[in-house]
Amino acid sequence: MMSNLPLDLVEEILSRVPATSLKRLRSTCRQWNALLKDRRFTEKHFRKAPKESLVLMLKEISVNLNVTPPSIEFKDALGLKDSHSNSEQVDIVQVLHCDGLLLCTTKDNRHVVWNPCLGETHWIQFKVDYGRVYSSFALGYIQNNESCRSYKILWRWKSNDYKSSPRQRGFEIYEFISDKWRVIDDVNHDSLVNHNYLGRCCRVSLKGNIYWLVDDVEDNSRSLLMFDFKTERFKRLCLPHFENVGHMVLSFVREEQLSVLYWSRATPKMEIWITNNIDTDATLLWRLHLDTRFNCVRIFSSLYFEEEKKVVLCCNVKLLMMIRSARTWYTLSERTMDI
C-alpha cells in the first residue's frame, strides 16, 4: 500500500500524476495534502508530470450547420464557487492564463486568481475609482530562484476625462507576497501614449511576462508590446511583415514560443507565425509555420495550436442580432478545413 512506501518515493510517484488528478488526492491524508501544497513539489511536478491541454469555454452554444462535426469533445466543466457569498457559481466573463493559474474577471467586476486543478482561489481587493475606465489586468511572475516564483498583477487604466489630451493613464502592481497595491511611477509612459491595445484576444502571459498586440495611431502600424514583471518596464518588439494590418490573434506554443494568427482583410489568406525564442535580451525572430486560404467568417478571438500536426483550433465570436454571442470552432490544416 502507498502508506507503507517511503515519503520520497511517494513524492516521486505523485510528481508524475497529471495535474487534473491531483485535486482529489489531497483528501487522502494530511501528509499528502501538505506535500501537494509544498512549492518545491509544485516545481518538481511541473517538470515531470505529463503535459495536458485544456480548452476553456466561458459559454457553450451549439450551432447546427448541417455538416459533419469535428471530433472534439468538451467535458469536465469547471465551476468556481464564491467563497464570499452563498451563490453557487461565479459568473466569469474574462480569463487570462499564466503558469497553470487563471486570472478571472467576474460579471460584477471582481477579480480572482484560481488554480482549477487544486481548487484554490485568491480574491484580489482593490480600490474602486469610477474616474478610471478601460481597465485591464494581467498576471505574471518573477523567478526568484530555481524553485520560487513571486506572482504579480499589472493593472492598466485610463481616466474618463475626455477633455484632457492625452488622457491620463496609470499602472499599478499588486504583489501576492505583500497583498498590497503600489503605483509604478517610473514606467515609460511616453512610449505608450499613441498605442491602442487590441483587446482580450491580443494578449498572452508567457514565462512570467505579458505580451500585447498594439496599434500605433500615428503611423497606422502594429507592434508587439511586452511588460517585464522583473524590471517593471515596457519593451516594444517586432512582428512579421504583413501586406496590410489585417486581423491578428496572439497566442503561444507549448508555453515556450509566441504565435500570431494573421488573416488579410483583402484576400482569403491566413497565416500562422511562430517565434524562435522569447529571450527578452535577443531580437525576436519569426518564421512562417502555416499558410492557407479559405472562405469563412474569420473574426477569431482565441486559438489553440498543435505544432507537430499543424492543426489549430480557433474560436470564432459573432454577434447575433446584437443580443448574444455564439461560438463556432474551426479546425484548420494545410489541406482541409472542418467546421
From Swiss-Prot:
Checking InterPro entries in the record gives: F-box-assoc_dom_typ1, F-box-assoc_interact_dom, F-box-like_dom_sf, F-box_dom, SCF_F-box_component
Q: Which residues form the F-box domain?
A: 1-49
PROSITE patterns membership:
FBOX
Which Pfam families does the annotation name? F-box, FBA_1
Superkingdom assignment: Eukaryota
**Cited SMART domains:** FBOX (SM00256)
Q: Which SUPFAM superfamilies match?
A: F-box domain
Q: What name does the UniProt record give this protein?
A: F-box protein At3g22700
Taxonomic placement: Eukaryota, Viridiplantae, Streptophyta, Embryophyta, Tracheophyta
